[in-house]
């Protein structure tokens, strides 16, 4: 395949896809990624996973502050690319950029468009209890994930799958569907199908507050919320005992409780017959497997309970508790 490709991408998801394209000898003439960002609690700048991969392969790299910068746009034109491939780049491309490549710009979206347009299709579909996701390749236009569909592939969403695990499954499949698309462009067999606007939905980026667990919902809905925000922005709650101020408790791993006859008010901490830490929900309960109390490391629920022996623990139902 002789098509010249400029690849736009930033996080690990995009790096996994890029690695697959390079493995199959796709002709990537340049890579565009976001500028390095400071590490949390440090001023040290951290390169994106895509940048690290591009440098290791000696691929020309661009990191514009703004994709509308005239100098950057001219640099893109100089590559005389046939196609731009965009995978989780993290910024909206202006029409002046979309018009540069000979055959247009194609985006790999980690969701089944037109549903879940936006930044968080993976997390949102799990939180909604969807059982099937997938990748959609679209020919980009000026809208947000509104372009015509070129190809679609499907990935089942397992009942215990987290957002992180679904992202890995989608990324591992992403290279294949893009290679198929590029081959169709090269052969002149590519087709495009307009999205059905009536079936569109939005998947905006999750806030940290959306990781706060709402225990007064049924356990299945709570479990979907936990899985959807794992690993980021992360599931958390507030716990208190003996009248002390509430403290944050991060939930690293959980499951639906199989215990029968769980009784308690939403947010009550209970023990199962197997001495598991359960949290009562509006219906059913959640079993906490691995947790991280504020100011401490990750631990299993037994260690947490041992550290609070004799104390009646209570989880908050809202952020004001």
UniProtKB/Swiss-Prot annotation:
PROSITE patterns: GART (PS00373). It comes from the Bacteria. One of its GO terms (cellular component) is cytosol. Keywords: Protein biosynthesis, Transferase. Its EC number is 2.1.2.9. The keyword Metal-binding does not apply. (6S)-5,6,7,8-tetrahydrofolate binds at residues 111-114. It catalyses: L-methionyl-tRNA(fMet) + (6R)-10-formyltetrahydrofolate = N-formyl-L-methionyl-tRNA(fMet) + (6S)-5,6,7,8-tetrahydrofolate + H(+). The keyword Cell division does not apply. GO terms for molecular function: methionyl-tRNA formyltransferase activity. Attaches a formyl group to the free amino group of methionyl-tRNA(fMet). The formyl group appears to play a dual role in the initiator identity of N-formylmethionyl-tRNA by promoting its recognition by IF2 and preventing the misappropriation of this tRNA by the elongation apparatus. PANTHER family: METHIONYL-TRNA FORMYLTRANSFERASE, METHIONYL-TRNA FORMYLTRANSFERASE, MITOCHONDRIAL. Belongs to the Fmt family. This is Methionyl-tRNA formyltransferase.
């Amino acid at each position: 395949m002789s098509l010249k490709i400029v690849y736009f991408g930033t996080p690990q998801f995009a790096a996994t896809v890029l690695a697959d394209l390079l493995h199959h000898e796709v002709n990537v003439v340049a890579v565009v990624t976001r500028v390095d960002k400071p590490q949390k609690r440090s001023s040290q700048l951290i390169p994106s996973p895509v940048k690290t991969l591009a440098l290791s392969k000696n691929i020309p790299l661009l990191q514009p502050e703004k994709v509308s910068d005239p100098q950057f746009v001219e640099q893109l034109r100089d590559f005389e690319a046939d196609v731009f491939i965009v995978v989780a780049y993290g910024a909206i491309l202006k029409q002046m950029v979309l018009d540069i490549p000979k055959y247009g710009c194609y985006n790999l979206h980690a969701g089944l468009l037109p549903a879940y347009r936006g930044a968080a299709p993976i997390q949102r579909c799990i939180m909604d209890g969807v059982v099937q996701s997938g990748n959609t390749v679209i020919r980009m236009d000026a809208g947000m994930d509104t372009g015509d569909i070129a190809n679609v592939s499907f990935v089942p969403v397992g009942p215990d799958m987290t957002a992180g695990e679904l992202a890995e499954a989608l990324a591992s499949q992403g290279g294949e569907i893009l290679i198929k698309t590029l081959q169709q462009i090269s052969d002149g067999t590519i087709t495009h199908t307009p999205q059905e606007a009536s079936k569109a939905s939005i998947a905006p980026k999750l806030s940290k507050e959306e990781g706060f667990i709402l225990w007064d919902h049924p356990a299945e809905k709570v479990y979907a919320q936990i899985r959807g925000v794992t690993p980021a922005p992360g599931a958390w709650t507030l716990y208190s005992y003996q009248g002390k101020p509430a403290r944050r408790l991060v939930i690293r791993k959980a499951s639906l409780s199989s215990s029968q006859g769980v009784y308690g008010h939403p947010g009550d901490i209970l023990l199962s017959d197997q001495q598991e830490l359960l949290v009562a929900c509006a219906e059913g309960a959640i079993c906490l497997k691995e947790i991280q109390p504020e100011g401490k490391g990750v631990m299993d629920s037994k260690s947490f309970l041992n550290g609070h022996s004799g104390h009646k623990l209570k989880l908050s139902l809202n952020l004001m508790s």
